[in-house]
């Protein structure tokens, strides 16, 4: 049978070694087989990957030469030859990405293109054949361009090689292994100060706060549709979700979240619960304030996870704390308050105890408490040459016709009680003081005319005497 086939020549529609494809009956020359189209598509994708990475195209054939007839029917399609990546390539890519992120941190140009191309990982031969048509390819690129309008290019790598994707997917199954490139957090200098506490497991987002989408296991799961790549986009939150997506995810996750948020409180033995703390857990000193008599619920925004975890201690410190009730006195004690006259007497009594009127004359000093009976700001007149019959009432009656008259007193001997022949009269108004000095001088009070002089009682006070002595020493008189 083989000789018959050899004698008959090449089969129609199959390529001959070193020659062109022989078209079969009813088959046009411009038509291509599925294998050739698959090879061209893989070569085009490999070239696109190399262009994105910026490396020269090496070792990738554009097309595979024709295969003999018998072998083409039995051998499966040859795989695409990919370049061998060295062991240090991962670190070099990381350093390159960090350098680009640091350079773009100062100036962030708007990203015009669509999301980065992930590659044909996870596609079967049947899926690849469907993407060959121009309609499917145009629809796929239009869909990518419409999904993500603009994203900051500094927050994730532009392209991830397939070998690194397979290596990361194999290592992510072990605990503590590195996360995929697209799921890694951005550079530390772009996010802000690091959170205190040990680092947590990869992506500590609770199920209710995570946006609906494919699982976060490996890059192979991020196949089209590419609506929401799991990369951080908002530096203000430091998470992979925006405010709108996070709120929708929280509302759709649990219907009883509103009831649970009212019961969440920080008390003597509690800490902020629920999705309030996202990422590494806060220290106990920040997450748990001082115990209060009555705990207050946290704001609803913190419970929903709409605020970053670093602002939770600030909110806890700004909460209004209940003041202890003031002890109210019994009703009977309200009438026992100290009245104002008692307060005035108390104020006057204090200076009286501290104030001492020390007099000095002829080299001797003594205390005269009788001066405390007079007003310190009055205008005082000395009345001399008084008769023995003149007392305080007679002297006051003589000067009482002046409106601002205050007090009149005759000085007597303490031991015998006899008058010393002089006294004092005080006025509040200086005009009355001047009138009394002019009108009453030489008038009869009792059986004798009185003599009026300006009172010099202040000149014998100890403080005044010392002040005058200092002034005389300065002038050089003594």
UniProtKB/Swiss-Prot annotation:
The keyword Magnesium does not apply. GO terms for cellular component: cytoplasm; U4/U6 x U5 tri-snRNP complex. The modification N-acetylalanine is found at residue 2. The keyword Nucleus applies. CDD domains: RRM_RBM42 (cd12383). Keywords: Acetylation, Cytoplasm, Methylation, Nucleus, Phosphoprotein, RNA-binding. Its main location: nucleus. Pfam families: RRM_1. Residues 343-354 have a biased composition (Basic and acidic residues). This is RNA-binding protein 42. Residues 1-20 have a biased composition (Low complexity). Belongs to the RRM RBM42 family. SUPFAM superfamilies: RNA-binding domain, RBD. Residues 234-478 are annotated as: Necessary for interaction with HNRNPK. One of its GO terms (molecular function) is mRNA binding. GO terms for biological process: negative regulation of mRNA splicing, via spliceosome. The modification Asymmetric dimethylarginine is found at residues 151, 156, 166, 179. Residues 1-33, 171-209, 317-354 are annotated as: Disordered. Interacts with HNRNPK. It is found in: Nucleus; Cytoplasm.
């Amino acid at each position: 049978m083989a000789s018959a086939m050899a004698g008959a020549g090449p089969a129609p529609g199959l390529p001959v070694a070193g020659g062109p494809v022989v078209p079969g009956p009813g088959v046009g020359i411009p038509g291509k087989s599925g294998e050739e189209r698959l090879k061209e598509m893989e070569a085009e994708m490999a070239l696109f990957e190399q262009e994105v990475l910026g490396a020269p195209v090496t070792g990738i054939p554009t097309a595979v030469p024709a295969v003999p007839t018998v072998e083409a029917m039995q051998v499966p399609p040859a795989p695409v030859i990919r370049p061998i990546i060295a062991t240090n390539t991962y670190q070099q890519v990381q350093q390159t990405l960090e350098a680009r992120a640091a350079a773009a941190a100062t100036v962030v140009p708007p990203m015009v293109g669509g999301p980065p191309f992930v590659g044909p990982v996870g596609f079967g031969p049947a899926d690849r054949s469907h993407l060959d048509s121009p309609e499917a390819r145009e629809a796929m690129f239009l869909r990518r361009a419409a999904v993500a309008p603009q994203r900051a290019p500094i927050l994730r790598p532009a392209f991830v090689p397939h070998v690194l994707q397979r290596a990361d997917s194999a290592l992510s199954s072990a605990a503590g292994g590195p996360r995929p490139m697209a799921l890694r957090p951005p550079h530390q200098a772009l996010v802000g100060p690091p959170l205190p506490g040990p680092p947590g497991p990869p992506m500590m987002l609770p199920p209710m706060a995570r946006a609906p989408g494919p699982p976060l296991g490996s890059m192979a799961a991020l196949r089209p549709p590419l609506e929401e790549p799991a990369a951080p986009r908002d530096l203000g939150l430091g998470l992979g979700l925006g405010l709108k997506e996070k709120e929708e995810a929280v509302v759709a996750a649990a219907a009883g979240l509103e009831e649970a948020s009212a019961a969440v409180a920080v008390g003597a033995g509690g800490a902020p619960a629920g999705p309030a703390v996202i990422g590494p857990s806060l220290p106990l000193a920040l997450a748990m304030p001082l115990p209060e008599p009555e705990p207050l619920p946290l704001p609803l925004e913190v419970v929903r996870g709409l605020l970053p975890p670093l602002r939770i201690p600030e909110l806890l410190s700004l909460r209004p704390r209940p003041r202890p009730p003031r002890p109210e006195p019994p009703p009977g004690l309200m009438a026992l308050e100290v009245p104002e006259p008692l307060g005035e007497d108390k104020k006057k009594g204090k200076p009286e105890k501290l104030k001492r009127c020390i007099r000095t004359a002829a080299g001797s000093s003594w205390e005269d408490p009788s001066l405390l009976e007079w007003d310190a700001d009055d205008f005082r007149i000395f009345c001399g040459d008084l008769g023995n019959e003149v007392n305080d009432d007679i002297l006051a009656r003589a000067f009482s016709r002046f409106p601002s008259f205050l007090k009149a007193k005759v000085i007597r001997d303490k031991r015998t009680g006899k008058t010393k022949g002089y006294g004092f009269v005080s006025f509040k108004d200086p005009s009355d003081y001047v009138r009394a000095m002019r009108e009453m001088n030489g008038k009869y009070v009792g059986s004798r005319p009185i003599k009026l002089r300006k009172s010099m009682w202040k000149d014998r006070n100890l403080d005044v005497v010392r002040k005058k002595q200092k002034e005389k020493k300065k002038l050089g008189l003594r």
